[in-house]
């Protein structure tokens, strides 16, 4: 796994139009190598945009959080492999993960199991009908992801250290809910700064609003990259 901050920062293109996404990618230029595309942009023509990004040499994390019957998940993953994506999320349910791993075998696609959304706190987990607190549920799903042969998991930085003890050093730990010091949390409830997340064991950081909504996105991304590099090179 690369130790370069540039390979570990994933800018979330949580934007309503392709034109806005293209503007951000153009603004960030060679400073940023990795982008995340989720539902909002995907359903505005973003899947073709994702192909174009990959073809231009950028890495693309397709945040689709797949969950369905085994065959449906497998067929979806097969097509996503053909798109040239670098990362793909699915909910960390054992059968779905196993189907995805089998479908992606032999490719470079890194499959990520989503444990508990970083917008959820303990009460949200209870309200959803789970008998566990978020931390316990994250660790259980991390173990299931490891057993299924997944490439990594998605979890908050708060759980990253404990997750590392379970999955080891080779799997990716991708962390959303990253907020630079002084930034607003927005709809995230379990957040950390870039430096805190790297120290906790996160391998990749997903940052959206603090960059794409910044007055100067390039300066914002460079500040985050510098903070990450300071920890990675220490």
Swiss-Prot record:
Keyword Glycosyltransferase: no
Amino acids binding substrate: 14, 36, 63-72, 118, 179, 188, 209
Pfam families linked to this entry: OMPdecase (PF00215)
Gene3D superfamilies cross-referenced by the UniProt entry: Aldolase class I
Enzyme class: lyase
GO molecular function terms listed in the Swiss-Prot or TrEMBL record: orotidine-5'-phosphate decarboxylase activity
Cited SMART domains: OMPdecase
Keyword field: Decarboxylase, Lyase, Pyrimidine biosynthesis
InterPro entries tied to this protein: Aldolase_TIM (IPR013785), OMPdecase (IPR014732), OMPdecase_AS (IPR018089), OMPdecase_bac (IPR047596), OMPdeCOase_dom (IPR001754), RibuloseP-bd_barrel (IPR011060)
Known catalytic reactions: orotidine 5'-phosphate + H(+) = UMP + CO2
Gene Ontology terms describing biological process: 'de novo' pyrimidine nucleobase biosynthetic process; 'de novo' UMP biosynthetic process
Enzyme Commission number(s): 4.1.1.23
PANTHER family cross-referenced by the UniProt entry: OROTIDINE 5'-PHOSPHATE DECARBOXYLASE (PTHR32119:SF2)
Assembly information from the UniProt record: Homodimer.
Similarity remark: Belongs to the OMP decarboxylase family. Type 1 subfamily.
Entries under HAMAP family matching the protein: OMPdecase_type1_B (MF_01200_B)
Function: Catalyzes the decarboxylation of orotidine 5'-monophosphate (OMP) to uridine 5'-monophosphate (UMP).
Protein name per UniProt: Orotidine 5'-phosphate decarboxylase
Name of the encoding gene: pyrF
């Amino acid at each position: 796994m690369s130790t370069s901050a540039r390979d570990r920062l994933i800018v979330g293109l949580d934007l309503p139009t392709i034109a806005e996404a293209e503007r951000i990618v153009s603004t960030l230029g060679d400073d940023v190598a990795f982008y995340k595309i989720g539902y909002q942009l995907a359903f505005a023509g973003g899947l073709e945009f994702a192909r174009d990004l990959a073809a231009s040499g950028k890495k693309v994390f397709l945040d689709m959080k797949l969950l369905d019957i085994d065959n449906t998940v497998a067929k979806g993953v097969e097509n996503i492999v053909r798109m040239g994506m670098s990362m793909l999320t699915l909910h960390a349910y054992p059968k779905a993960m196993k189907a995805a791993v089998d479908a992606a075998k032999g490719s470079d696609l890194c499959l990520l199991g989503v444990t508990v959304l970083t917008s959820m706190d303990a009460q949200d987990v209870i309200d959803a009908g789970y008998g566990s607190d978020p931390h316990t549920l994250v660790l259980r799903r991390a173990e299931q992801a490891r057993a299924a042969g997944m490439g990594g998991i998605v979890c908050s930085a708060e759980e990253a250290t404990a997750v590392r003890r379970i999955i080891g050093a080779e799997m990716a730990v991708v962390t959303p809910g990253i907020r630079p010091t002084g930034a607003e949390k927005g709809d995230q409830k379990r957040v950390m700064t870039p430096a805190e997340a790297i120290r906790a064991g996160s391998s990749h950081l997903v940052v959206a609003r603090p960059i794409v909504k910044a007055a100067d996105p390039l300066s914002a991304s460079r500040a985050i990259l510098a903070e990450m590099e300071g920890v990675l090179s220490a």
